Design a protein with these regions (language model features):
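Catalytic domains that recognize anionic headgroups
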Residues: 1-154
């Protein structure tokens, strides 16, 4: 069985408190984005952990990959290559892998998401996909982008 799920949490709008209760309309407009984001992230993390625990209890050899599509983007600020803190915050993806009986080597530790499935297939299904170069792009407009991986990845 293969299941792919894109969970839209903790994306904006930030509507959940850390215990899963909905915030009030007043709180929605009063809370700072960072505070609201962290509360919703805590709630999301607890739900993801519940799912992972159920998968581990039900299946003896599950393959589990949990990833974010990007890091925290405060107010959806424009990201520029001269703002290191904004770049680091925005592109700090979360990646967690559970492959039964397999430990990834340092060369296989993904720095970006581009190789996630290549690593999964190579380690679990006998493939030999070459790992791609890590790249991170910011877009100045629809037709112009800049690779900033050299700035964020040592």
């Amino acid at each position: 069985m293969f299941v792919f799920s894109h969970i839209m949490l903790p994306h904006h709008p930030y509507i959940f408190q850390s215990d899963g209760t909905l915030i009030s309309d007043t709180e929605y407009f009063e809370l700072q984005n960072e505070t609201a984001y962290l509360s919703q992230l805590q709630f999301t993390n607890s739900k993801v952990l519940d799912v992972v625990k159920k998968l581990l209890a039900k299946d003896t050899q599950p393959i589990i990959v949990v990833q974010s599509d990007h890091g925290f983007r405060f107010n959806h600020d424009e990201i520029t290559s001269d703002d290191y803190a904004s770049m680091e915050r925005s592109f700090s993806n979360f990646s967690a892998y559970y492959f039964p009986d397999i430990t990834l080597t340092n060369n296989e530790q993904p720095l970006t998401l581009v190789n996630s499935f290549r690593i999964l297939f190579n380690n679990n299904f006998g493939t030999d996909y070459e790992l791609l170069e890590n790249k991170i792009f910011i877009s100045k407009n629809l037709f112009e982008s800049e690779n900033i991986a050299h700035i964020l990845i040592p």
